[in-house]
Amino acid sequence: MNLRPLHDRVIVKRLDQETKTASGLIIPEAAAEKPDQGEILAIGNGKILEDGKVRPLDVKVGDRVLFGKYAGQTVKVDGNEVLVMREEDIMAIVQK
């Protein structure tokens, strides 16, 4: 991928969601909600503060994160859909 996000933006790849329920029912792709978890593919340099200083981001490439259903802007890169969002749209980092 040849995208480098600016400032406090990150590029996230949505993680595949389970298509089968706990009871074994298969959920059709059209009925499944978009996953709200993803993996950070790239990060910007940091948030520019009012005093002009740059605060580094809390997330790093490879982190698994949780975000809101409507967070970010979907873009296609090399035929793959990714999300470009601000770090503030990320709700949590999933601990391994």
Curated annotation (Swiss-Prot):
Q: Which domain of life is it from?
A: Bacteria
Q: Which Pfam families match?
A: Cpn10 (PF00166)
Q: Which UniProt keywords apply?
A: Chaperone, Cytoplasm
Which cell locations does it reside in? Cytoplasm
- Cytoplasm in keyword set: yes
Q: Give the record's GO CC terms.
A: cytoplasm
Q: Name one GO biological process term.
A: chaperone cofactor-dependent protein refolding
GO MF entry, a single one = protein-folding chaperone binding
Describe its assembly: Heptamer of 7 subunits arranged in a ring. Interacts with the chaperonin GroEL.
Q: Output this protein's name.
A: Co-chaperonin GroES
Give the source lineage, highest ranks first: Bacteria, Pseudomonadati, Pseudomonadota, Betaproteobacteria, Burkholderiales
